[in-house]
Amino acid sequence: MKFTLLAASLAVLSLGACHTNQETTSAGFADSTKIVSLSGAISEVLAGAGLEKNIAGTDITSNYPEALKVKPKVGHNRNINAEGILALRPDLIIGLKKDFNPALTAQFKTAGVKLLLVDQEYSVKGTKQLIRTLTDSLHVSAKGDSLISIVDTELAKVKPATHKPKVLFIYARGAGTIMVGGTGTQVETAISLAGGQNAVTEFADYKPLTAEALVKANPDIILLFDSGLQSLGGPEGVAKIQGIKETNAGKNKKIISMDGELLGSFGPRLGIAIQELAAKIN
């Protein structure tokens, strides 16, 4: 079970699991529609479009804006439990296509609940398309225009690093679970948008961290999620990992972190996330 949950979490961080096309189902939306949202990015779009009051429940990654933290939680979007969702008596379930297998989809349809399933591409274009698809489907297109405009405005404020520092992303859940991000991940895309470059190019997705790989990559900066940094005991704990002190990042104590949902969701706050990352790596 531990391996399954880890694999699920890393799959969310991989670009390879996503597609560029968007697919929608008629949402049949009304002011009284009760929605269960199964993605942090989707929930942010709904809230930004003025539909927060319609959200009856969310997955555990939906914690922004603050009001969503008190919404009933139905588990992780990579391990969807139909019974828990149906107990909230939703009219509409919105999620990512990759999280729904045919049996699960059939279960919701048999229960008479409408589904709106979309693909998500972790890019600037993909973020805008996600906003457009959701707001058009829910008949709040003007709100979508505003959200897309905000994304553009915030991205325009980014002051990318001029020297393209080598950034190594470490995904950690305590000292026993430490993975390093290779190519083809959404964090790599974020690093690139912020003006940096991925320190690891030899492999795709995520692999266990080794001292040899660390020294070879020799990153200028080590990046973690806030939760990952905390799980390792802060910067001091990261510095104790074998190989860290031999890197430029370790020697110069360049260990940074960001909120995982902000950095990795590629929702309406994408521009804000890239601004923050650019400031940290510059």
Question: Where are the language model's segments positioned?
Answer:
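Extracytoplasmic ligand-binding site segments that recognize negatively charged/polar headgroups
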Residues: 119-132, 166-186, 230-233
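Bacterial N-terminal signal peptides that target proteins for export
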Residues: 1-6
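C-terminal motif of bacterial Sec signal peptides marking the signal peptidase cleavage site
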Residues: 14-17
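Basic- and aromatic-lined ligand-binding clefts that recognize polyanionic substrates
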Residues: 28-46, 142-194
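His/Asp/Glu-enriched short active-site or ligand-binding loop at hydrolase and phosphoryl-transfer sites
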Residues: 59, 183-206
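Structured C-terminal subdomain patch of bacterial secreted/periplasmic proteins
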Residues: 126-136, 145-146, 159, 226-282
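A short, structured surface patch at a secondary-structure boundary
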Residues: 34-88, 92-97
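Bacterial signal peptide processing site
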Residues: 19-22
